[in-house]
UniProtKB/Swiss-Prot annotation:
One of its GO terms (cellular component) is Golgi membrane. It is found in: Golgi apparatus membrane. Keywords: Golgi apparatus, Membrane, Transmembrane, Transmembrane helix. Coiled coil: none annotated. Its main location: Golgi. This is Golgi apparatus membrane protein TVP23. It comes from Pyricularia oryzae (strain 70-15 / ATCC MYA-4617 / FGSC 8958) (Rice blast fungus). The keyword Translocase does not apply. Belongs to the TVP23 family.
């Protein structure tokens, strides 16, 4: 007799449960490809400059895809940087989907947040490895990778906190009670400070 195949539970790390499997697989491919080229590039390509260029291009593609496509489709979050033309001050702008319009798939969310936080840690490990092995020539590439991955990690973390605070204030405000007004005022003041 054939046993019935067990279906993975919602939120488990199975790409088949994703609401956007192509977006998820592309996101994961970009996340992993730069690390793989950095780690195994010298085995297949005997040219450090070519490995450097390919890794930088993959990191840039990953940064763009994560910031503009994967974040919006997988977890309903997006961020960008705006510069005030009069003062020249720069500030981040966070956008999240409306609570009632998009339901975030738990599988997409787990893959997204795991990849967001794991990649900077892996690059830090590779920086330590480059230092231990006295391969200082690779440190600029690792530094660029860290800047790009940590920027996205920080921005999406702040965007998620902003989204949760906005949703909390919005739900409190919609009840029309005194606590709702206080919560809305506090959250409004918190995010209006520059």
């Amino acid at each position: 007799m054939m046993e019935a195949q067990q279906q993975p539970s919602a939120g488990s790390l199975s790409w088949r449960l994703s609401s956007h499997p192509i977006t998820l697989l592309t996101f994961l491919a970009f996340r992993v490809s730069s690390l793989l080229v950095y780690l195994f590039g010298l085995i297949f390509i005997d040219n450090m400059v070519m490995i450097f260029i390919i890794t930088i291009l993959l990191l840039a593609a990953d940064f763009y895809y994560l910031k503009n496509i994967a974040g919006r489709r997988l977890v309903g979050l997006r961020w960008w940087n705006e510069v005030d033309p009069q003062s020249g001050d720069s500030h981040w702008v966070f956008e999240s989907s409306e609570p009632g319009t998009k339901t975030v798939n738990p599988t997409d969310s787990r893959f997204f947040w795991l990849a967001i936080y794991a990649q900077p840690l892996l690059w830090i490990g590779l920086a330590v490895l480059a230092l231990v092995r006295l391969k200082f020539i690779w440190l600029p590439l690792v530094a660029i990778a860290l800047v790009l991955t940590i920027t996205n990690s920080l921005a999406f973390s702040r965007c998620d906190k902003f989204s949760q605070a906005s949703n909390l204030a919005g739900s409190a405000f919609s009840t029309g009670n005194l606590a709702g007004s206080i919560a809305t005022g506090l959250v409004g003041r918190l995010f209006s400070r520059s």
